[in-house]
Each structure stands twice: as C-alpha cells, then as structure tokens.
Curated annotation (Swiss-Prot):
GO biological process, one term: electron transport chain
Organism placement in taxonomy: Bacteria, Bacillati, Actinomycetota, Actinomycetes, Mycobacteriales
A single GO cellular-component term on record: plasma membrane
Catalysed conversion reaction: 4 Fe(II)-[cytochrome c] + O2 + 8 H(+)(in) = 4 Fe(III)-[cytochrome c] + 2 H2O + 4 H(+)(out)
Listed name of the protein: Cytochrome c oxidase polypeptide 4
Length: 143
C-alpha cells in the first residue's frame, strides 16, 4: 500500500472509533440541563469526517495502485528523486512586484469601500497580469 493512502486511512480509523465512543458516551450521560440521548451534531460531524477521510483514502489507494513506485515509497530514495522541473523563472521581471502593488491597491479599495480605488485596482491588476503573461512575447528591443 502506498504512503498517501495510509496517511488517510489512519484518521479514518481514529474518527470512526471516536464516533462510536462519542455516540455511546452521549447516550448514557445525563446532566440536569439536557435530555438523555444521542447528541446529534457531534455524532454526525464525526461520522461524516470519517466518511470523507475514507473516501479520500480509497481514492488515493486506487490512484496509486495504477502508478509506478513513487519516491516516497522507495526506501533508498533521495530528495532529488522527487524534485521535478520547477519551470522558468525570470529574475529581472518587474511585473510580479507591480502585480502585488495592484493587489494591495485593490485591497485598500475593498477595505475602505472606495469604488474608485476598486475600479483602478482592478484595471491595474488586469494590466499587470497581462504584462506578466506577455513579457516574453515581445522582442528584446521592445523591453
């Protein structure tokens, strides 16, 4: 069995056990202010949480059966075995910083509820996203 599926089966067993304990505990606890019986909100939450982690574990199990041995399942794997290509990074690009400024301007507009700041921030954000995506689509002499 693969490691990701095991990581999800553990919480499933824990939450299912806690749901059973919780249901039996709330059935037999009686204090002066409540009616004796199952406390439904916590019971349903624990059962649904166990079901959701079970679904995720089964999905990961079925998915990982179809793939080859992963580096995290191989005992002699190195960190570099998992590392893939990170992609191209442009260290001289101004557009990520400009985009952050546009997001900040837009956030100030939302916080202070100024419509003109929201509109200008959205226009700046669209402009900087476009320039970031198209910066290598123009020739070098146009930079």
């Amino acid at each position: 069995m693969k490691s990701s599926a095991k990581l999800m089966y553990g919480p499933t067993v824990f939450m299912a056990a806690m749901a059973v304990i919780y249901i039996f505990a709330t059935m037999h606890v009686s204090d002066g202010g409540s009616v004796k019986g199952v406390e439904w909100v916590g019971s349903v939450a624990l059962v649904l949480s166990a079901g959701l982690t079970l679904m995720l574990g089964v999905y990961l199990h079925f998915t990982e059966v179809r793939v080859d041995v992963l580096p995290e399942d191989w005992e002699e794997a190195e960190v570099a075995d998992k590392a893939g290509t990170l992609g191209f990074f442009s260290p001289s690009s101004i557009w990520p910083a400009a985009m952050s400024g546009a997001v900040g301007f837009l956030a100030f507009g939302v916080v202070y509820f100024h419509y003109w700041m929201i509109a200008v921030g959205l226009m700046l954000l669209i402009f900087t996203i476009t320039k970031l995506n198209l910066q290598y689509g123009v020739p070098k002499e146009k930079h």
